[in-house]
Amino acid sequence: MAKKPTALIILDGFANRESEHGNAVKLANKPNFDRYYNKYPTTQIEASGLDVGLPEGQMGNSEVGHMNIGAGRIVYQSLTRINKSIEDGDFFENDVLNNAIAHVNSHDSALHIFGLLSDGGVHSHYKHLFALLELAKKQGVEKVYVHAFLDGRDVDQKSALKYIEETEAKFNELGIGQFASVSGRYYAMDRDKRWEREEKAYNAIRNFDAPTYATAKEGVEASYNEGLTDEFVVPFIVENQNDGVNDGDAVIFYNFRPDRAAQLSEIFANRAFEGFKVEQVKDLFYATFTKYNDNIDAAIVFEKVDLNNTIGEIAQNNNLTQLRIAETEKYPHVTYFMSGGRNEEFKGERRRLIDSPKVATYDLKPEMSAYEVKDALLEELNKGDLDLIILNFANPDMVGHSGMLEPTIKAIEAVDECLGEVVDKILDMDGYAIITADHGNSDQVLTDDDQPMTTHTTNPVPVIVTKEGVTLRETGRLGDLAPTLLDLLNVEQPEDMTGESLIKH
């Protein structure tokens, strides 16, 4: 007899917002979502700031969202931990950071600092760069080179000059530091093995073959004149006495989110790297703020805090079968992040990875691989052996990042079509679905003056529980979703999962 599956369906980047202006969620024709919304119990929950372990007012993101959802509690994020360590002064006593600097001082070499130069707070925060500069000054490092990756995605599309000017003011205040290279994150922070992009960033960082400008500002302004926004600035070298990352140097990469920092790190710190031909840097001390992946030989500045009793582990302990399914862009989120930073499958877990389309930007194919994800899930459901399903539709977030309204509306409409087939199938099997999101984005893709808005929002996300006859609490947070799943599965909630079921009892 087929099992009755319980599914968590995450519409990535899909939040509630009253105004229709630039709101693809409101403007899209989504008959299936609306049908479930009108028929079943609903509420909305918080997905940003203190509710997900981020600083107050900080927008949520997919990594943080999935981590909180899977843990069933507030998970204090790297950004919050690092900020606190700087405030407490522990940062300046950190062994790994001090070892990197000791390496430079003993080799009379250079300290290179890599990172995303913005206050987006999703992958990095430029105030962490300032703390590194202060530490280097305190320890008497003379040669400090900053390799800046421009954002334009988690912050305004053309905001780089503000961060560059503030950083140069910090260089002047401390009397150390200079920009050595600048790359748009499209090149330096790819995560889909598009090595031809990373190679351009690598060449600029190694001072090999890249356009050269007198200042960082001049290079960015030239890029703007060519119609490029920060994210897409072609990597360039800033003229100075720096000759790139060399033997005996040290690198500190201050991005704390792993997924878009791993590839560049593999080029420098994975001896088995084969993406393209590289000249290995000898005796390089390579440090990363967090652990990016197992292939990278790096010293870790902030070790991971282990999370036990995530939704996957509880399912395993109760002999339940589970499926994690998403396309490439969100696959790490339904697996690694949902499992609290664990890569290995749990007993009874299987996974389906559907390739994301190979297009330059997803506004060119707003449906992405939603239909293929849906087909794969229906195939899995037909096996009749699943207790728990965790599914992510990437489109509202990934297309929302384009800041283009029409493609984002199309993205949501494609997802809605798939949602209808999936949920109806689950209901036919006497199962339940929780339809929700991890953070906002597609709810505002235009600013009030109709400029593209490519960032996430701090708006609350909807929750639909397809179980008639129950009442949901009026408020909650992402950490309440796993307890709600356990409630539907009739599984006892462990003590360290401190969220509360959204179903009133």
Curated annotation (Swiss-Prot):
Family that this chain belongs to: Belongs to the BPG-independent phosphoglycerate mutase family.
- Spell out the protein name for this chain: 2,3-bisphosphoglycerate-independent phosphoglycerate mutase
Binding site residues for substrate: H123, R153, D154, R185, R191, R257, P258, D259, R260, K330
Cofactor binding mode, per the note?
Binds 2 manganese ions per subunit.
Transmembrane stretches, start-end:
none
* Self-association state and partner proteins as the record states: Monomer.
The positions annotated for binding Mn(2+) 2 are D12, S62, D438, H439
CC terms in the record's Gene Ontology section: cytosol
Q: Which UniProt keywords apply?
A: Glycolysis, Isomerase, Manganese, Metal-binding
The UniProt entry, under HAMAP family, shows: GpmI
Gene from which the chain derives: gpmI
- Pathway listed: Carbohydrate degradation; glycolysis; pyruvate from D-glyceraldehyde 3-phosphate: step 3/5
Describe the task this protein carries out: Catalyzes the interconversion of 2-phosphoglycerate and 3-phosphoglycerate.
MF annotations from Gene Ontology: manganese ion binding; phosphoglycerate mutase activity
Name the CDD domains for this protein.
Answer: iPGM
Can you cite a GO biological process for this protein?
glucose catabolic process
Enzyme Commission number(s): 5.4.2.12
Per its UniProt record, the required cofactor names are: Mn(2+)
Active-site residues, record numbering mapped to chain: S62 (phosphoserine intermediate)
UniProt organism field: Staphylococcus aureus (strain COL)
Higher taxonomy? Bacteria, Bacillati, Bacillota, Bacilli, Bacillales
